[in-house]
Amino acid sequence: MDTIVWTVALMAAVGLVGSVLLLIVSRKLAIGEDERLTYLMSILPGVNCGACGHPGCEQYAKAMMNGAPPNACTTGGDRVAQALAAYLGVESTGVVQREAFVACQGSLDHIDPQLVFKGVPSCRVFSTLSYSSLSCPFGCLGYGDCAEACPFDAVVVENGVARIDTAACTGCGTCAKICPRGIISMVDQASSPTASVVTCKNTMAGAKTRKVCSVGCIGCQKCAKTCPTQSITVENNLARIDTDTCIGCGTCIEVCPTHAISKLVFQ
């Protein structure tokens, strides 16, 4: 009987000691994880723009602790990527430069307003109510939701159209996500420091486009026929440029009769 009691007591003591040791180790590991997270957070910009594909900087830091690559922060650029890689002890391949551009040039100089909207000055509200203040149903509404949302003040509205300050743009994509008409796009830099982009989203036939906007794409295919790298196709009356293969030569810009193609310079 005594043997059984002592055996049970010994097992209980071993279990207690083991539990205490596990608690101590887990707390030390937790402290270590907290320290890593804090340090990674100190390197990141802390603007929570979501360009990395995560809701915020903390979530990205946690993802890196679980193996995510350190080069997803376009806001921080190569400097932040290298610092993160050095701390994590991994190799950084550098950050792919990304720029936003507005696929619309329909300012008040090129398009006629159809009505005056007297309400909340918001693109989202205006779009939800299905109003069309412009003769072009694809154009920028110009109420500046994108400018208000940009954490870097890289978007301004000039003469009724949003414009991106490429020097201030970090490629976070906040403006593109909030635009109700989807006319703001993100372009990743390929081999060339410049790329040609179509600054129009109008898919109406060329004759109809000419009636509503003087700088809209009319689908004439001149750009596609002259592109030396065959980077341009015309689908549904709208030219589309593959920026991965575009070398930024500008040939398409020169031949476009409505000046609906512009050069995008990566900063």
Model-derived segments and their meaning:
Residues 162, 238-239:
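Hydrophobic residues embedded in beta-strands of well-ordered beta-sheets
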Residues 229-238:
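Cys/His-clustered metal-coordination modules, chiefly Zn-binding fingers
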